């Protein structure tokens, strides 16, 4: 009896913040700056474990649950948005090798998606700054997801597969955050982790195909 052929990898799905773009450290600095006037701090480790890879909506909810800030959700969003615009206006660095990898994959016929918890305007602005928006065949952003279904839920990667016209078995995810790793694992898509702010905890490392 002939064996079944394994699915052929045809699609690569990228996270953005902390993987392609060096923005997670900026987000950490934003949250630290927001908390400091009220006498609170957040460690880099706690930021990476609690906030990295998640939507701003989820993160603002978590911030207000963890810290007794005299701010409404709307005020918190507004302050973070204003501070981030100042940071991003100064320019954000691409991760080393990111543009070269995207170019290689494009030239070799892979379908490429961006699956980011960011909002579209913010992401497009950053991608256009580096001239890499055209490398992607599909985009999925945080606001595209059902309420409460951002990472670590699998929806963002399953939608990316649908947009690319591929299956989870034919895709590969590149991620840096634990939330993203769990989302890919739950979607039954192999995931490579490229750590940014910290190395994934053992439970998340076990979900990856490899840690680079």
Regions from the language model: what does each represent?
Residues 62-100, 108:
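Metal-dependent phosphoesterase signature
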Residues 20, 94, 112, 173-174:
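Conserved SAM-binding loop
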Residues 119-172, 178, 182, 186, ...:
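Substrate-recognition "cap/lid" segment bordering the active-site pocket of phosphatases
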Residues 210-212:
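Short acidic-hydrophobic, aromatic-tinged amphipathic segments that line or gate anion-handling sites
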Residues 37-68, 73:
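Alpha-helical substrate-recognition element adjacent to the catalytic core
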Residues 99-100, 104, 177-180, 191, ...:
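Short glycine/proline-centered loop/turn elements that form peptide/ligand docking sites
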Residues 31, 98-127, 184:
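Substrate-recognition element of Asp-dependent hydrolases with the DxDx(T/V) motif
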Residues 2-49, 186, 200:
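Active-site neighborhood of HAD-like aspartate-dependent phosphohydrolases
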